[in-house]
């Protein structure tokens, strides 16, 4: 799973989140640093309104938070979601002695991104792809 800092970089680069069951997220509050939550039809559901998406915390009586604007949540994309977001640019994932290498096709060239964690290698590749699309 990618670190909050990497997820924040993705959001700042323009990656938008449409919450779905199974999605992991963090709450942008210092007292909840490092905590992960999962969107679930049983406990945390996205509710769509004209003003935006609200995450409703259902059946969590010990929780002092009833709902949260999606803008106050930080999506932590999973490895499969990151790979899907790379779309046709994705070439392959390879194991290296120090971790993983993700290869993408970008501007007619193969670009490689390495990290000890496969999810972070995917995220770095996606950041590069997003950066190239807005340049």
Regions found by a protein language model. Name each.
Residues 4, 22, 79, 119-122, ...:
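Functionally constrained cores in energy, signaling, and assembly domains
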Residues 1-31:
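Extreme N-terminal leader/activation tails
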Residues 19, 28, 33, 120, ...:
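Generic alpha-helical propensity signal that fires on short helical segments
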Residues 16, 35, 40-112:
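N-terminal segment of the canonical double-stranded RNA-binding domain
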Residues 2, 74, 117-118:
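Short amphipathic alpha-helical segments
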Residues 111-135:
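Ampiphathic alpha-helical segments that act as solvent-exposed interaction surfaces
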């Amino acid at each position: 799973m990618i670190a909050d800092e990497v997820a924040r970089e993705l959001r700042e680069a323009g990656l938008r989140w449409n919450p779905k069951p199974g999605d992991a997220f963090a709450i942008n509050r210092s007292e909840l640093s490092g905590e992960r939550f999962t969107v679930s039809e049983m406990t945390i559901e996205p509710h769509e309104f004209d003003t935006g998406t609200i995450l409703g915390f259902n059946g969590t009586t010990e929780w002092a938070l009833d709902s949260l604007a999606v803008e106050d949540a930080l999506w932590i994309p999973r490895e499969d979601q990151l790979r899907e977001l790379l779309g046709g640019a994705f070439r392959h994932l390879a194991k290296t002695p120090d971790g993983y290498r993700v290869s993408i096709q970008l501007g007619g060239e193969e670009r490689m991104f390495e990290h000890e964690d496969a999810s972070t290698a995917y995220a770095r590749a996606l950041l590069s792809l997003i950066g190239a699309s807005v340049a």
